[in-house]
Amino acid sequence: MPTLRSATASASTAGTASPTAIATPRSAKRRLTSPRRAAGSPDASQFTSPHKSPNVGIVGTPKLLSASPRSSRKRLYGDFVAAEKPKWNPRGKSPESHFSRAQSSDWDLTKEFICSADPAQMQVVKEALHVATVPSCGLVCRDDEQSRVLEFCKGCVEQERSGSLYVCGCPGTGKTLSINKVKESVARWADETGMETPDALSINCTSLAKTHEIFSKILAKFQTRKKATCKLSPLQQLQTMFSHKESAPRRMLLVVVDEMDYLITRDRAVLHDLFMLTTYQFSRCILIGIANAIDLADRFLPKLESLNCKPLVVTFRAYSKDQISDIIKHRLKVLEYDVFEPLALEFCARKVAAASGDMRKALGVCRSAVEVFEARLQESSDQEFGLVTFDHMDIALSKAFKSPVVDSILCLPQHQQMVLCALANTFHHCKKKATTLGELNKSYIEICRSTQVPAVGMLEFSNMCMVLSDQGFMKLGQSKEDKLRRVMLQIDSSDITFAFKGNRFFQKCLEQQKF
């Protein structure tokens, strides 16, 4: 085999020097290892199979690209695919990787890999639905309430006057989050207009060891320098400060008192004195109280109304189903992929809106539905990447709105549960409000016969009914004979039906006709 040197010498003797012949060893090696790059060169025949014609045409390399179906698809549809919203992949891997792993001999390892959910993606979804997570898009569905509070604060700052406002509403209606947003808006507005930015103080009354400590926190924010008044209580120091122009602070103070219900004492003195701080002539306090009680200002502050200083009341109404759905969708926008089926979200919104309108409850239900979906994903080997469905949401809602009575029923022994089933059947079929212990025993025996469970004797049956009566499930009357004692159901029969939902054994007991 001739060497490169001899090949070069012979080529120069012949007088026909080709580009390949005069190439250096390094360039020749690069061309040999990159036949795709060399396909467009004049000597492409040296790098192609002798049985196939080289892909050389008028346009050279672009023709080689057009011969690849994959490249053609990427050119034609690449822009369209990129514009689509990416799918949620809860397993963290693509279906192709699952398929390739499934072809391996280690099937146990592959099955464990396929059945495991991606904890990183699950955690991102749960954090987006967490109550403590402040949505980047801002608070939606509370524009009117925020506008009223903001205008109130602006008026106080512009006129350098004190004022009080009371924010009320059911739990989970966005009160605290809205007021925090207003605080930021007030500071931003003051900077833009050249006004002096007011100081801000947020107090959660649940953190106070004693109710009167709230005055110490307010006094510390003003940073008074007078030492002669140290013998006075913090409330007295504030009252003295706001009564004289010389001692009054120059800067306004925005005080936000959350969970104001905890300040309600027997004499209501703390709550009354707190609102009265805004009535002094040289007061610089803008007080905003937040509580769940809608009529707190009417019930606990009658003196304020007589002094013509009743606070402005802003009520946050419970969220509607459309508002709950919109808020959840806004939180999920940061994920850039769909997690819930639309029907599942609508079901959650309708259920929570009908019950309480509590947004925190709705977010908790959605997180629970994701956990149910995650548990199902661990158990299933299906390679399809589904969404959180209506069934997952139904399970989560059942857990969230389950009555404490249901938990008590599920903790009872089997025969006592069967007695409750017999009692529910008796009242359901006969439409009665009461029966006798003897009739209830017949229904119980019929259930035992149909389920092939040995029934207990009459004495033990009577003792079981007495235990159920002591626990509040039923009420037993008095009689000389046990069989004639009146029995009344003390709980809702729907709780019994709901407790045994999905249990085949007790479903059969509840379907039993009256004996």
Curated annotation (Swiss-Prot):
| Bias (Low complexity) | 1-24
Q: Which GO terms describe its molecular function?
A: ATP hydrolysis activity; DNA replication origin binding
Q: Which family does it belong to?
A: Belongs to the CDC6/cdc18 family.
**Per the record, where are the segments of Polar residues compositional bias?**
43-52
Its localization reads: Nucleus
- Give one GO biological process term: cell division
Mostly located where?
nucleus
Q: What is this protein called?
A: Cell division control protein 6 homolog
Keyword flag Nucleus = yes
CDD domains registered for this protein in UniProt: AAA, Cdc6_C
> Could you tell me the gene encoding this protein?
CDC6
What is this protein for, i.e. what is its function? Answer: May be involved in the initiation of DNA replication.
Stored PANTHER family: CELL DIVISION CONTROL PROTEIN 6 HOMOLOG, CELL DIVISION CONTROL PROTEIN 6-RELATED
Q: Entry's SUPFAM superfamilies?
A: P-loop containing nucleoside triphosphate hydrolases, Winged helix' DNA-binding domain
**Can you name the source organism?**
Oryza sativa subsp. japonica
